[in-house]
Amino acid sequence: MSINISNIKKLDKFEDFKKVFNTVFSEFPFFESWTEEEIRETYNLNQREGIIFGYYNGEDCLGFISMRNHHQYEHPIDFKGKKSIYISHIAVLPKYRHNGIASALVPYALDFATNLGYEYAYLRLNDDFPMGLGIAKRNEFVRDFKVCQEVTHSRTHRRSRKPDDLRVFMFKEL
């Protein structure tokens, strides 16, 4: 599959978001169950406070990246008043992974944030999720070893996922 930056555009159709979100987060390694209302709330939050970019092959959305303003109350990472943005989701449909879609979406979104005057971008990742950690490291995010967060998975629907896990924070100066 040849990755082309011109295939990235603003994702503004809930159905595109839902298809990718529901597929990615219901399967390995997440195994989460989300209602349509919860997915819509997540979509609306990212549309209201940020932006979602989709990677399209024709009319088909194969993946997306969403980011929104960082609020200090939401995550325990502090940028000392600097304008910062939270990359809340990077999701690619399983059969299109390892083709460079996420690797195209991340720098595209970071360039967009830089042009809006953001000084930092950050992600919150599972500490045992090598695919996410690899994407972050390839894009020069560094881990903040002073900050972590334990998360309980209230949406987990299979026992193959541990009930709690550690989320780590990685950031990048833009």
Identify the role of each PLM range.
Residues 148-174:
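C-terminal "cap" of GNAT-fold acetyltransferases
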Residues 92, 98-111, 138:
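Conserved acetyl-CoA-binding loop-helix of GNAT-fold acetyltransferases
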Residues 59-64, 85:
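Glycine-rich phosphate/pyrophosphate-binding loop shared by adenosine-nucleotide-utilizing enzymes
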Residues 113-125:
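Conserved GNAT acetyl-CoA-binding A-motif
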Residues 1-38, 54-56, 168:
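Short amphipathic alpha-helix that is part of the acyltransferase structural core
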Residues 87-97, 125-126:
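A short, internal acetyl-CoA/4′-phosphopantetheine-binding micro-motif in the GNAT/acyltransferase core
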Residues 29-56, 64-66, 72-74:
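Active-site rim helix/loop that mediates acceptor-substrate recognition in acyltransferases
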Residues 103, 115, 127-146:
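Conserved active-site alpha-helix within GNAT-family acetyltransferase domains
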